[in-house]
Amino acid sequence: MKSLAKLKAEPGIWLTRTEKPKLGHNDLLIKIKKTAICGTDIHIYNWDEWAQKTVPTPMVVGHEYAGEVVGIGQEVKGFTLGDRVSGEGHITCGHCRNCRGGRTHLCRNTVGVGVNRAGSFAEYLVIPAYNAFKLPDEISDDLASIFDPFGNAVHTALSFDLVGEDVLITGAGPIGIMAAAVAKHVGARHVVITDINEYRLDLARKMGATRAVDVSKESLKDVMTDLGMTEGFDVGMEMSGVPMAFTSMLESMNNGGKIAMLGIPGSDMAIDWSQVIFKGLTIKGIYGREMFETWYKMASLIQSGLDLTPIITHHYNIDDFQQGFDMMRSGQSGKVILDWT
């Protein structure tokens, strides 16, 4: 089958042919229709330090997808041939304390689709049926293919009560932008998002952010004054992994504020703990999506009118994958979709 794989331990990704994956007793075989390029895929493409330590070669990569069930393992119940599905990219062990305690997303033995095992940038993917999510008819393949990062946004945004609250999001990547859209949709008052990438800040405006702030040109304090905010933000979402952004967030939070952190700093990051302690801040680390509460929330948000279509900015046929990766790496895009049909 045709696939995109990390064939060599060097920058790049290659269109190649690999064997069709074998179906296990508890698995689904999925014919891939659409895939989306993730920031993780860019790390793997660039072959940075994280990728070198984490990703085996050769291996088919990718973990954001939508497809159709074309094979069902003999022990699987609840799926039929032709079902449209996306799927959870974190495969969990099922036997550790967190898995058995219903906190599956915190499994200590997680294996990543397209990171530690064969991924979805291929004509076919095999995953455990437990990880598949059946798609409602009104959710398009395009939208379903970005459910993985949308889930990161939803998990982060819904970690704390947002109704009537003022929200600060640092980092206007696709996940940060989708988190802004979720926050407005569920009833936040002001949603302010910061970055230095004007293309993506403009996308955030289209997705409903109250203010999208280029912090290289505009002061966050001035924006708060313009919005009539006198006490700081109630909820923060750190999506950038940039130490300066987190420092700014700590300074801008109201006493008793709550921060959800998804962005991963590139190295050790100094924190002014006096801000955390004297303001009584709560900081929560976010990893992946809650299985599968986040997935049902995602579908419900779209069914209730949340419009994510502006975040999908580019489409390419899989044969033109290099253009898609170049576009993602440029920073001048939202989500980039690769078509396998």
UniProtKB/Swiss-Prot annotation:
It is found in: Cytoplasm. GO terms for cellular component: cytoplasm. Belongs to the zinc-containing alcohol dehydrogenase family. This is L-threonine 3-dehydrogenase. Its main location: cytoplasm. Transmembrane segments: none annotated. Homotetramer. The gene is tdh. SMART domains: PKS_ER.
